[in-house]
């Protein structure tokens, strides 16, 4: 890396790195460093009356106070932080005091990793600390961390910019309190979910991510190309159709927790790559699945929060069963006053116009129109967990017809905090009906609906061999974690959410500067001074530019021959 691309602190740290090596200290040792305690455990287990406990810990230096022959550092490990008391004569018991005077005081920085061996004690100020007897350099940080300071519970110099936090999650995790806890709770959500399904006797499976047909949901897929087979493939939008094949194959229940991909918009609750759990159980229906879902979410909420309640954006949400159950057409009538029962596509389209819905177009069929009405007027109203049930057949191409309500299906979506959390059916297992549903989807595709499903002939073949009555559900893990941790954006529960490309400062190539008579070695210097394109130099005062670039030459010890003010004036004149 060009030295001009480094900050002053980065240069100092790289020089320190070289000094450590010159002293024979490996700043990145390969050997295992054995630890026997974590910061939180040391504090929790300390008792004043006990014999001093000998510990070996390792972590990152987050703050330090150097006071001559004695110093304090704050060490951060994977569990928390603890104060370490370091004295020159303790870590340098012999005549050689280099480890303290040079290495610790001069060459180590905030962000560096060190190992500490010593004993636990309580300081005169009452803080449980480690009295260091040995210090080992474990990893040198050559880029300074943003240092967040706290006073009276208020954070200063915070690393708060969302774009920076999401791009540099590794920094966010180090410096911002509570971030790591969110992701530990995410792990608890997934672990509790998996344990519950395993205890129920269901089998965790893996199905293809690259699929020849993007089936199982109404969504726009990502497309890629397999060079060897010379075919287009799709990143899966759902696991449904493959999991149902396994039910045909004889499994009692199967589930998969994995990534799905949808080539659609990004917002506070949508990421194009997301984690979903899908479960299919034979001989069950959607009524059983509603009860099972209630028990499952109760258990997860207790595991994460210690109770059946969570708080999101100031709203207390209770996952204690039972949840309200409301047919979708009743919900629409309740919120809009319109009864859509028995209405044709054209009648519903007219209702959309009367409701002054602007996003409606001719490519939308009856199911899509109903979905749009529900999304605009109803969905956001359901804060407490609510099962929206009995969707029209046009909205549910993979769902069994309702046993007593003509034109409707045995489907529910679970709404929580105004968003869909889960989608479930009594699964359609009539192969002839399923084929007709697929054909209707193809008719919608011909009208321009780019979210219509494609016919999956192999899935139809599997159904023809016979699939038992089955209920299935898909639960969005990311949204579930948002609810359980009180987050209001999906980006806060994804380690690395999808981002727009990072903005890169436009810089002219060296050749453009050289056309003005500027030596190639001086181009990075001029750009370091802020003149990233030759046009940036057009109106600058020649003396200012001369002063800027000569100052950089001196500061960074580049040892270039300085141009004269006349030389700089000639460069600028050529631009006029």
UniProtKB/Swiss-Prot annotation:
Domain of life assignment: Bacteria
Main location: cytoplasm
A Pfam family assignment: tRNA_anti-codon
GO CC list: cytoplasm; cytosol
InterPro entries reported in the protein's UniProt record: Aa-tRNA-synt_II, aa-tRNA-synth_II, aa-tRNA-synth_II/BPL/LPL, DUF4332, Lys-tRNA-ligase_II, Lys-tRNA-ligase_II_N, Lys-tRNA-synth_II_C, NA-bd_OB-fold
Cofactor(s) required, per the database record: Mg(2+)
HAMAP family, sorted: Lys_tRNA_synth_class2
Summary of subunit composition and partner proteins: Homodimer.
Entry protein name: Lysine--tRNA ligase
């Amino acid at each position: 890396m060009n030295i001009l691309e480094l900050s002053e602190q980065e240069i100092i740290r790289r020089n320190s790195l070289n000094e450590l090596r010159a002293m024979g200290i490996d700043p990145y040792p390969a050997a295992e460093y054995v630890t026997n305690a974590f910061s939180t455990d040391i504090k929790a287990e300390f008792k004043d009356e006990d014999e001093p406990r000998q510990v070996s810990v390792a972590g990152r230096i987050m703050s330090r106070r150097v006071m001559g022959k004695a110093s304090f550092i704050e060490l951060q490990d994977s569990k928390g932080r603890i104060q370490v008391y370091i004295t020159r004569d303790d870590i340098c018991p012999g005549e050689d005091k280099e480890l303290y005077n040079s290495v610790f005081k001069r060459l180590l920085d905030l962000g560096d990793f060190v190992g500490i061996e010593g004993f636990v004690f309580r300081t005169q100020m009452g803080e449980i600390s480690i009295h260091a007897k040995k210090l080992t350099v474990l990893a040198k940080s050559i880029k300074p961390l943003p240092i967040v300071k706290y006073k009276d519970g208020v954070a200063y110099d915070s690393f708060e910019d969302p774009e920076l936090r999401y791009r540099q999650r590794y920094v966010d995790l180090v410096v911002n309190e509570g971030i790591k806890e969110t992701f530990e709770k995410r792990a608890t959500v997934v672990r509790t979910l998996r344990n519950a399904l395993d205890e129920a006797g269901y089998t965790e499976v893996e199905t293809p991510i690259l699929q020849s047909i993007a089936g199982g949901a109404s969504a726009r897929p990502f497309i890629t190309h397999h060079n060897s087979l010379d075919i287009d493939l799709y990143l899966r939008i759902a696991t449904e159709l493959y999991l149902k094949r396994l039910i045909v194959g004889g499994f009692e229940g199967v589930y998969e927790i994995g990534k799905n991909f949808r080539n659609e918009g990004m917002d506070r609750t949508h990421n194009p790559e997301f984690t979903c759990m899908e479960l299919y159980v034979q001989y069950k229906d959607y009524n059983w699945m509603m009860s099972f879902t209630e028990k499952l979410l109760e258990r997860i909420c207790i595991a994460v929060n210690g109770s059946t309640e969570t708080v999101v954006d100031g709203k207390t949400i209770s996952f204690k069963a039972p949840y309200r159950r409301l047919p979708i057409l009743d919900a629409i009538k309740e919120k809009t006053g319109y009864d859509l029962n028995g209405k044709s596509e054209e009648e519903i389209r007219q209702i959309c116009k009367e409701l002054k819905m602007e996003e409606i177009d001719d490519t939308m069929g009856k199911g899509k129109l109903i979905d749009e009405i529900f999304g605009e007027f109803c969905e956001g109203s359901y804060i407490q967990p609510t099962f929206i049930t009995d969707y029209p057949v046009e909205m549910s191409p993979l769902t069994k017809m309702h046993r007593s309500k003509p034109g409707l299906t045995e489907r529910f979506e679970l709404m929580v905090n105004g968003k869909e959390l889960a989608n479930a059916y009594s699964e359609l297992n009539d192969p002839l009906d399923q084929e007709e549903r697929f054909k209707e989807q193809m008719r919608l595709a011909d009208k321009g609906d780019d979210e219509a499903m494609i016919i999956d002939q192999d899935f139809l073949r599997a159904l023809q061999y016979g699939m038992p009555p089955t209920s299935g559900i898909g639960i969005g893990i990311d949204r579930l974690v948002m609810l359980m941790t009180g987050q209001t954006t999906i980006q806060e529960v994804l380690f690395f959410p999808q981002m727009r490309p990072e903005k890169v400062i436009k810089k002219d190539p060296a050749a453009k500067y050289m056309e003005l008579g500027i030596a190639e070695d001086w181009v990075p210097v001029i750009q370091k001074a802020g003149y990233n394109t030759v046009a940036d130099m057009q109106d600058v005062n020649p003396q200012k530019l001369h002063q800027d670039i000569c100052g950089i030459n001196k500061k960074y010890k580049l040892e270039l021959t300085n141009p004269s003010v006349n030389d700089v004036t000639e460069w600028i004149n050529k631009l006029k």
